[in-house]
From Swiss-Prot:
This is Ranatuerin-2Ca. It comes from Lithobates clamitans (Green frog). GO terms for cellular component: extracellular region. Keywords: Amphibian defense peptide, Antibiotic, Antimicrobial, Disulfide bond, Fungicide, Secreted. Belongs to the frog skin active peptide (FSAP) family. Ranatuerin subfamily. The keyword Lyase does not apply. It holds the Pfam family Antimicrobial_2. InterPro entries: Antimicrobial_frog_2. Disulfide bonds join 24-29.
Length: 31
């Protein structure tokens, strides 16, 4: 349903941001 899809989308967003932050810590952030 719509709610589940929205939840999945939000989870993907959060996971993506966490991954980006992790990459920054490991490899160093480049603007």
């Amino acid at each position: 349903g719509l709610f589940l899809d929205t939840l999945k989308g939000a989870a993907k967003d959060v996971a993506g941001k966490l991954l980006e932050g992790l990459k920054c810590k490991i490899a160093g952030c480049k603007p």
